[in-house]
Amino acid sequence: MEEAIRARGVTRTYRSKGRETVALAGIDLTVPAGATYGLIGRNGAGKTTFIRIASTQLLPTSGSVAVLGHDAVADPRSVRNRIAVIPQESRPLYFLNVYELVYLYLKLRGMPGTEARRRTEAVLVELSLDSRRKTLVSHLSGGMRRRAMVAMVLASDAEVLFLDEPTTGLDPVARREVWSAIERAIRDRRTVLLTTHYLDEAEALSSRLALIEGGRVLLEGTPAEIRSRIPRPFRVSVQGRVTREELLPYGEVAEVRGGHLVFAREEEARELTRLALAKGFPVSMAPASLEDVFLQLVGRPIGEDDPEEEGTA
């Protein structure tokens, strides 16, 4: 298997006001060439810190990262020549219009003018930005500005794309357009490393995933493999006047608005479903989603953040 990104024992520690914060606590990852690899986890889990290290923006405290065979610390220039990055917080050149932003980015990467113009035109249409081509970036909404940054990177000829929360702030239609553009990059055999806390996005785009919590990889594999590794792979949603104590014999119980979620093995899930139906309670049973996997492993929803520290998102 050809490797695009190889990380071994990557740590990152911050010191502030006499206090030490561990952002990464020994990350091992291998991203195959041509794959889309998703890093999922809450804000503060360490996803952005890893992206910044792998894309040569930040030095690790220890460990190593190689991108396309080049060491990100010892040979950062070779890495930068072959990657493109959408940071979590983008700061585009506000005095340019949308067309200029994309076109000049491609020219600065060394792309010939004719090809840069062709790619700029194509990506503006693909991401529904053509009508805004002459709009100054400073006049765009936050979501439109984010979409322009995505256009820059996807129009490039970079072999590895680092996309840190690429669809943050976008409406559902715009998110789907970005997904389609990322899928095109995948078809072009480019490697994509993306972070997201939208689990539907992670599952739709990623051939492999790493679930990160507290600077560590908790689980790694395909979406199907990750779901299969939890002890209770089914979820039963029970509404009505039923107590947590009544449900505990069937599995792990989480309280939700209007009822309970029970994570259970298949036999217990079916038994609980039959019992709830017999008592007239609204009930549904389904295979566990990635959101359910996260909740079982971490004990908190993915949308519930850790206290934010510098660089630890």
What does each model-found stretch correspond to?
Residues 103, 107, 114-132:
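Conserved ABC ATPase "signature" region
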Residues 161-165:
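Catalytic Walker B motif of ABC-type/P-loop ATPase nucleotide-binding domains
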Residues 220-221:
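ABC ATPase "signature
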Residues 1-7, 13-26, 76:
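A short, flexible loop at the N-terminus of ABC-type nucleotide-binding domains that lies
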Residues 155-159:
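A short, proline-enriched helix->beta-strand linker immediately N-terminal to the Walker B motif
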Residues 232-304:
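Short, charged/small-residue-rich alpha-helical element at the C-terminal edge
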